[in-house]
Amino acid sequence: MLRSKLCLVLLLGSVVQAQAEGLATDKVRWHGFISQGLIQAPETNFVNLDDSISAELTDIGVNMSWALSDRLRLAGQVVYLDGGRRYTKGTRLDYLFLDWTLHSDFDWRLDMFVGRFKNQHWLYSATRDVPFTRNAIVLPQSVYFDSFRDIAVGSDGLAFKVTRTTSLGEVELNWSWGATNLSKEQSQILLSQLAQGDAEQDYVHQASLFWRPDQSAWQLGISLLDSDFTYEKAEQDYYSDGAMTVQRVMFNGRYAAEYWELSSEWVQERLDIRDFYAPGFTRNSFSQGWYLQGRYNLLPRTWALLGIDLFDLDKDDRSGRQFSASTGGLVPAYFAYQDDLTLGLTYDFKDNLRLTMEHHWVKGTARLAYPVMPDLQYNTSEYWQMWAMQLMYWF
């Protein structure tokens, strides 16, 4: 947290220094956002453990973009996030990278990013922490699993982006290689409080392709992910030394018209676990999920949201019966799936002041903490509900 606060001071200091030195305003730009809300998800461990209405729904951020030259740009953002038990609370360096434009002309452009960059491969992965850029307060958990947020949101490493304009429209290709450092708290959000050892992401390798047809409101895409993790147990630990491989294939589409829009993503994820639970243990499974969200402009400044989000922990065991049987019936079948119906309403008081409200009706608990250790104490119901409201301001 101290490192992130220092980065925030340096980021703000850079802006002040740049302005004091008389740099053109088009060279240095800074923006920010502040949001606060209320949320409740009874009978689950999603937000808290006492079923109460929680104010742990805070997003604050400040970002800067500094054009060092015509081809070189420095960009950074520091955020403070509080999502309750969904992910790590506190201040963090969201991104800080150099963007080097290697080539740019009328038809195509090539950029290289070095440093801590955002995940550009999914529809909302790069902006999921910026409240006014997403359709819902709580994103579809089949794809944007909150317990995995700190790993999925970005990486330290190298990335490239190529955009090409053709007679059929614009094509965008993204490639990245990097890793994310996991703190003890982040590891325990994934592995439960029983984890006393060190979890490490060895690497994450991603690629994505997007196509935006000419004179069309459509965007279609595909993305691939491959990542390895290792776990080194502590002297006194519930788990063993082990390794995991996560691989994803995703398809996505978005249609944005003047008064309505649709967005959807489909994912199949392979999880290969070696040892970890016990020496010699192996498990190889394929989960599947997808969501469809629609927004409609009901009235001036007012949008309605309808979404459906489905997830199955094992595509060959959608009912969860085999999963439950493998635990001797100790873990209910509803821990193997999670289906969500969402209704929401958004009202813009001003161009930069928005109130969003939503309600979720959920069946199953597969996307509640902890991914590798079902929480039978707090996730006690197959059917549960959640509501949230959030006021956001950006500048």
Residue ranges of each PLM-predicted region?
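Short, solvent-exposed loop/turn and secondary-structure capping segments
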Residues: 43, 124-127, 317, 368
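Transmembrane beta-strand segments of Gram-negative outer membrane beta-barrel proteins
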Residues: 22-45
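Cleavable N-terminal export/targeting peptides
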Residues: 1-23
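Signature for the C-terminal beta-barrel architecture of outer-membrane proteins
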Residues: 101-102, 106-112, 148-292, 296-304
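Surface-exposed strand-loop-strand hairpins of Gram-negative outer-membrane beta-barrel proteins
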Residues: 37-58, 188-195
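Outer membrane beta-barrel
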Residues: 27, 37, 51-183, 210-214, ...
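Transmembrane beta-barrel strands of outer-membrane/channel proteins
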Residues: 32-40, 76-80, 112-116, 173-179, ...
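Outer-membrane beta-barrel pore domains
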Residues: 48-49, 221-395
